Amino acid sequence: MAPRPLLLLLLLLGGSAARPAPPRARRHSDGTFTSELSRLREGARLQRLLQGLVGKRSEQDAENSMAWTRLSAGLLCPSGSNMPILQAWMPLDGTWSPWLPPGPMVSEPAGAAAEGTLRPR
């Protein structure tokens, strides 16, 4: 009688060890996790890229602001030697922009701009 339970035990244990486990079916939660992870990784990569660009931009902004300050100081207070430089900035057709109203521009002398204005008595 002892061989019968032993045989039954061997059949149960041997049968389960002989068959490989069926492959696990892909679940919706696996895809959700994978897509969420990919999205988070992409967001982190873009954030690092933007931080790198902003860091570079802030360094460039400091350099550019200094250059514009120097340039604007020369444009706002032109000396006689800078006048050809100012005229070089004027477009060839004499119009600055189609959106700006016609009138005196930077390259025109101040006397022409002052003509026709009323002076207080």
From Swiss-Prot:
What family, per the record?
Belongs to the glucagon family.
| Any one GO cellular component localisation term in the record | extracellular region
Q: What job does the chain carry out?
A: Hormone involved in different processes, such as regulation of the pH of the duodenal content, food intake and water homeostasis. Exerts its biological effects by binding to secretin receptor (SCTR), a G-protein coupled receptor expressed in the basolateral domain of several cells. Acts as a key gastrointestinal hormone by regulating the pH of the duodenal content.
The subcellular location is: Secreted
Kindly name one Pfam family recorded for this protein: Hormone_2
Record PTM Valine amide, positions in chain: V54
Q: Which domain of life is it from?
A: Eukaryota
One GO MF term, please? G protein-coupled receptor binding
Tell me the GO BP annotations in alphabetical order: adenylate cyclase-activating G protein-coupled receptor signaling pathway; brain development; diet induced thermogenesis; embryonic digestive tract development; hippocampus development; intracellular water homeostasis; negative regulation of gastrin-induced gastric acid secretion; pancreatic juice secretion
Q: Which UniProt keywords apply?
A: Amidation, Cleavage on pair of basic residues, Hormone, Phosphoprotein, Secreted, Signal
Induction info: Serum secretin levels are increased after single-meal ingestion.
Chief location of this protein? secreted
Q: Where does this protein come from, organism-wise?
A: Homo sapiens (Human)
Q: Which residues carry this modification: Phosphoserine?
A: S58
User: Propeptide at which positions?
Assistant: 19-26, 58-121
The name of this protein is Secretin
Q: How far does the signal peptide extend, from start to end residue?
A: 1-18
